[in-house]
Amino acid sequence: MSKRLVAYFSASGITAKVAENLADAIGADVFEIQPEVPYTKADLNWMDKKSRSTIEMSDPNSRPAIATKRDNMDEYDTIFVGFPIWWYVAPTIINTFLESYNLKGKTIIPFATSGGSGMGKTNEKLAPSCPGAKLLHGKVFNSYSSKADLSAWIETLSL
């Protein structure tokens, strides 16, 4: 069995809950992707065209800085990457995270939380950030997703 990591970014705590349940269900290590400058409630106001999140998501080259890196990334074969869906894709801080490592030969599996949006163009936007990695199609979960739901999803991946 390969060593697994569940890395996640959570703005509201919902993705954190799903990530912790996933890690517990599959016996994986956990790493929180934290922005160097934490997001405020105003930063996350998607209705404000001048909010930080809106500005970042409007710029495909935006790469918000992350506070810390995972030192032993080379030990992991499979990396689950979790995030809330923003504008039908992963927040650009996920690109920052992926681009911070050599992921060649690793399996990357995105998972997301959303109140109603699907994965949209997430894989299309993440693929350039993890060259040489096997990027699987992910799944969206809601805040009520149980460990059993997550385990059932993992079974479909044939890892």
Give, region by region, the residue ranges found by the protein language model.
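Glycine-rich, N-terminal phosphate-binding loop of Rossmann-like dinucleotide-binding domains
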Residues: 83-84
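Short, glycine-/small-residue-rich phosphate/pyrophosphate-handling segment
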Residues: 109-146
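Acidic catalytic loop of the alpha/beta-hydrolase fold
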Residues: 87-88, 116
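N-terminal beta1-alpha1-beta2 submodule of the flavodoxin-like/Rossmannoid cofactor-binding fold
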Residues: 1-78, 88-90, 95-99, 148-159
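Short, conserved loop/helix-junction motifs that constitute active-site signature segments
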Residues: 73, 99-105, 129-130
